[in-house]
Regions:
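Acidic-enriched and Gly/Ser
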Residues: 2-142, 157, 162, 167, ...
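Short, charged beta-turn/beta-strand-edge "cap" motif at the junction between a beta-strand
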Residues: 148-151, 172
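Short, Lys/Arg- and Gly-enriched loop/turn segments at beta-strand edges
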Residues: 151-157
Length: 196
């Protein structure tokens, strides 16, 4: 077989039919220098690398005024959606030191796409304050939110300090939790169907 010099198509993996398979991207957690999260996100965007910085708006009260402030939900961390080539490019930024890895391993920990979609949905549509819980929460009942701004979100119903919360688990990072009335959720089975 003769491969032309500039024909990169032949060097990519192929599926059964022979067409090129797209390079797979995955979500990783990059560790960032303290207070450099927003700047790093801007630089990654300029480089053309998809990234996600979880920011939540909060109202801060002083004696003479109130101000809406953006708060980084996970300090010193930014999510990047990269393939192997972009994974190396991200580390060229001086504000990024490394990727979060699994304990005892050297490969970066991958956050599943479904978890990221649920987490982003929760951040985008929640009216309530989202809290991150790193302490282990007992697995809760699988539920789907049926009312309110989070309608359609699937997660777990957990009880923390007597309050019902919907939790979205993130690999290696714990749970993102938000208060929700128990009447706004319905149980679902493992495959996503309604339970009787």
């Amino acid at each position: 077989m003769i491969i032309k010099k500039n024909d990169d198509r032949n060097l990519l993996p192929t599926d059964v039919i022979g067409s090129c398979v797209a390079r797979s991207k995955r979500w990783l957690v990059a560790i960032v220098r303290i207070c450099h999260e927003k700047k790093t996100g801007e630089r990654l965007t300029k480089m053309g690398i998809e990234n996600f910085l979880p920011i939540q708006q909060e109202v801060h009260q002083w004696s003479d005024r109130r101000k809406i402030v953006d708060r980084v939900l996970l300090p010193m961390m930014i999510f990047v959606h990269v393939d192997l080539q972009e994974q190396k490019e991200v580390l060229t930024l001086s504000s990024i030191s490394r990727y979060m890895v699994l304990r005892g391993e050297s490969t970066p920990a991958v956050i599943p796409d479904q978890q990221m979609l649920r987490f982003k949905f929760m951040l985008d549509y929640s009216d309530e304050t989202i809290s991150m819980s790193t302490s282990p929460l007992a697995p809760g009942e699988k539920i789907r939110v049926i009312k309110g701004p989070l309608a359609g979100l699937e997660g777990e119903l957990v009880h923390v300090n007597g309050k019902s919360k919907v939790a979205v688990r993130l690999t290696m990072l714990g749970c993102a939790c938000v208060d929700i009335p128990a009447g706004c959720v319905e149980p679902v089975s493992e495959n996503g169907d309604l339970r009787d």
